Amino acid sequence: MAVTKKLILASGSPRRVELLAQAGIEPARLMPMDLDETPKRSEHPRSLARRLSAEKAKAALSAITGDPAWDGSYILAADTVVCVGRRILPKPELVSEASSALHLLSGRSHRVYTGICLVTPDRTLRQKVIDTKVRFKRLSTLDIESYLASGQWRGKAGGYGIQGIAGGFVVKLVGSYTNVVGLPLYETVNLLVGEGYDVHDRWLEG
């Protein structure tokens, strides 16, 4: 049996690790990349997701270059952007920012873009951007105050995590659910398979 080449995940997101585990994929190394995620002037949310995922992948590649232990490895990076129209809703740092985001999302449709970037063993970059449309119910004051108190908004693009309490806010979703969680699993697995990564290697171990 051919040896499966190592996969580096250029992220520290527990959600992305969990999603990969669902597909039987276990990264050999996690490499969170601390980059400036500020959008450029007039940058479209889709373009931002694409750019940041590529920058994370390139930063991880630069960090391992020259280390023979990681020769021929794959590097996977992702970045998720939530927006209402072209207004980008970043990860809130303060309760007030999360509150503003929830008020904006209330009763409206928004889009979630996730850019995924794969560095192949021959150091070629392969990219995709996945788009999901989500509509929230009209949130009551109690909904918002209770959600803020739960703390589940922390570290989440757009100030919410669909896999938690906020899943009950969703009236309609068109597209990939896992994209909203943080990594479009179907598209990610297809990208890996298309570039020769053996995703089936650990299925029998379960």
Curated annotation (Swiss-Prot):
UniProt cofactor(s): a divalent metal cation
Site (Important for substrate specificity): R15, T80, Q163
Record's protein name: dTTP/UTP pyrophosphatase
GO cellular component: cytoplasm
EC assignment: 3.6.1.9
Keyword Hydrolase: yes
Enzyme class: hydrolase
GO terms, biological process: nucleotide metabolic process
Domain of life from the UniProt record: Bacteria
Protein source organism: Rhizobium meliloti (strain 1021) (Ensifer meliloti)
InterPro entries cross-referenced by the UniProt entry: ITPase-like_fam, Maf-like
Subcellular location, principal: cytoplasm
Location relative to the cell: Cytoplasm
Residues at the active site: D79
Keywords: Cytoplasm, Hydrolase, Nucleotide metabolism
CDD domains the UniProt entry points to: Maf
Catalytic activity: dTTP + H2O = dTMP + diphosphate + H(+); UTP + H2O = UMP + diphosphate + H(+)
Known function: Nucleoside triphosphate pyrophosphatase that hydrolyzes dTTP and UTP. May have a dual role in cell division arrest and in preventing the incorporation of modified nucleotides into cellular nucleic acids.
Gene Ontology MF annotations: dTTP diphosphatase activity; UTP diphosphatase activity
Similarity annotation: Belongs to the Maf family. YhdE subfamily.
